[in-house]
Amino acid sequence: MSATGLTRRNTTSQIEAMKGTRPIVSLTAYTTPIARLLDPHCDLLLVGDSLGMVLYGMESTVGVTLEMMIAHGQGVMRGVQKACVIVDMPFGSYQESKEQAFRNAVRILKETGSDGVKLEGGEEMAETVAFLTARGVPVFGHVGLMPQQVKTAGGYRALGRSEEEADKIRRDAKAIEQAGAFALLVEGTVETLAREITASVGIPTIGIGASPACDGQILVSDDMLGLFSDFKPRFVKHFAQLAPTVSKAVEAYAEEVKARTFPGPEHTFQPKK
C-alpha cells in the first residue's frame, strides 16, 4: 500500500512480469520530497547506496551504513504511492554470510516497508540470493561494475571488453537469475554484452551505462537533474541543469536579505486591527 493507504504500489512480481513488454523506468530516490516528484513517472525507485556520495560527500559507497539506508528508505516510503521501492544493502551488511544477509534484509523490509533489497555480486553471492528468496525476501541483483568493490576492481571503468571479463559477467547474470532474483541491474558494461545478457536471462535487466536494449534504465536522480557536479560519467545525460538554478535562487535570496527587502509585508504577520 502507499503512504496514504489508498492505492496499490507496483510489486516485485509486476516488475518481473514487465520483461519484454515496455521499458521499465527507474531512478534513485533518497528523500520524501524527491520521491513524491519521481513517483508518478517511475515504475521502480531505488534507495541507492549512492546516497553516500551524492548526499554525504563520500568518495565511494563503502562508508554507507545500514542505519543510513534504513533512514532514507523510510523517507522515500513516505513519498510514494505507485512505484516499487527497493533499498540497497550497504557494503558489509551481507557479504559475511547468508544468515547475516537475511538478518539485515529482514530489518530493512520491516523498518522501511520497502518491497525488496538490492545487493551486488554474481556467482559468489548466488547462494546468499537463493537463501533470501527462499525465505520471502525479494532480491534485485546487480552485476557488471559493482561500486562497493571498486577498491579491488581497478576503479570505475567499463567492463566486458575482454572475453574473460565478459564470460564472468555472463556467468554472474545467469547465477543470480537462477538464484531467484526478480530483476538484474547491469552496470558499466560494454553495450553488446548488456544486450546479450538481456536476451539470455528470463528476468528484466535494468541498465546503467549498459545498453538501450535492456528491459529498463536507471540513473542517479541527482546526476540526471544536473545537481551532482563532482564528476559526470559518460552514461549520464543531464535532462535538466538545476545546479545553476539553485545557485541563482540562493544569490537572489542573499541579496534581498542584505537589502532588507525580504521578508516583505506579505511574508510577515501583523496584529489584528
UniProtKB/Swiss-Prot annotation:
GO terms for molecular function: 3-methyl-2-oxobutanoate hydroxymethyltransferase activity; magnesium ion binding. Binds 1 Mg(2+) ion per subunit. Coiled coil: none annotated. 3-methyl-2-oxobutanoate binds at residues 49-50, 88, 118. The active site is at residue 187. It is found in: Cytoplasm. It is an enzyme of class 2 (transferase). Its main location: cytoplasm. Pathway: Cofactor biosynthesis; (R)-pantothenate biosynthesis; (R)-pantoate from 3-methyl-2-oxobutanoate: step 1/2. Mg(2+) binds at residues 49, 88, 120. Its cofactor is Mg(2+). CDD domains: KPHMT-like. Belongs to the PanB family. Catalyzes the reversible reaction in which hydroxymethyl group from 5,10-methylenetetrahydrofolate is transferred onto alpha-ketoisovalerate to form ketopantoate. Homodecamer; pentamer of dimers. This is 3-methyl-2-oxobutanoate hydroxymethyltransferase. It comes from Rhizobium rhizogenes (strain K84 / ATCC BAA-868). The gene is panB.
